[in-house]
Amino acid sequence: MRAVVQRVTSSSVKVEDNIVGSIGKGLNVLIGISKSDTLEDLKYIRDKVINLRIFQDEKEKMNLSLLDIKGELLVISQFTLYGDCRKGRRPNFMDAKGGEEAKELYEEFLSLLKESNLKVETGEFGADMKVEINNDGPVTIILDSSKNF
């Protein structure tokens, strides 16, 4: 599982010009699910996302987590995080899990996040979405449950 985590002052996502998810201060999280992902991968990324110390404390040091600040989450599925561009000019998405299996894992990931009692908003799985992100910092972290980076 891969996640692109961005610290935001606000973020929203639209489907067909309708806002389907919107948050204030917190994290915008783009999620990619691979063919090999399991529940353990979901838990690993969930724990990293809610516990990353990327919010500033009173000394302006990145020392606080999303849980510490009681921030909000906007989670958006993005299979293109598994695009392989090493050959040719068009990305290959062979490693991305597709269809219903990916949707089930995505929904399980959302359930795990909601256990943290944080506000969790989402996009619409598989839809064409327009995402507005007001980066804070900017601070952007890339996570990979198979620890490739």
UniProtKB/Swiss-Prot annotation:
Name the source's superkingdom: Bacteria
GO-annotated cellular components: cytoplasm
Report the catalytic activity: glycyl-tRNA(Ala) + H2O = tRNA(Ala) + glycine + H(+); a D-aminoacyl-tRNA + H2O = a tRNA + a D-alpha-amino acid + H(+)
Query: Any idea of its EC number?
Result: 3.1.1.96
Q: Name one GO molecular function term.
A: Gly-tRNA(Ala) deacylase activity
UniProt keywords (A-Z) are: Cytoplasm, Hydrolase, RNA-binding, tRNA-binding
User: Where located?
Assistant: Cytoplasm
The Gene Ontology biological process terms listed for this entry are: D-amino acid catabolic process
Q: Which family does it belong to?
A: Belongs to the DTD family.
Assembly notes: Homodimer.
What is the role of the protein in this entry? An aminoacyl-tRNA editing enzyme that deacylates mischarged D-aminoacyl-tRNAs. Also deacylates mischarged glycyl-tRNA(Ala), protecting cells against glycine mischarging by AlaRS. Acts via tRNA-based rather than protein-based catalysis; rejects L-amino acids rather than detecting D-amino acids in the active site. By recycling D-aminoacyl-tRNA to D-amino acids and free tRNA molecules, this enzyme counteracts the toxicity associated with the formation of D-aminoacyl-tRNA entities in vivo and helps enforce protein L-homochirality.
Record protein name field: D-aminoacyl-tRNA deacylase
Lineage, top ranks = Bacteria, Bacillati, Bacillota, Clostridia, Eubacteriales
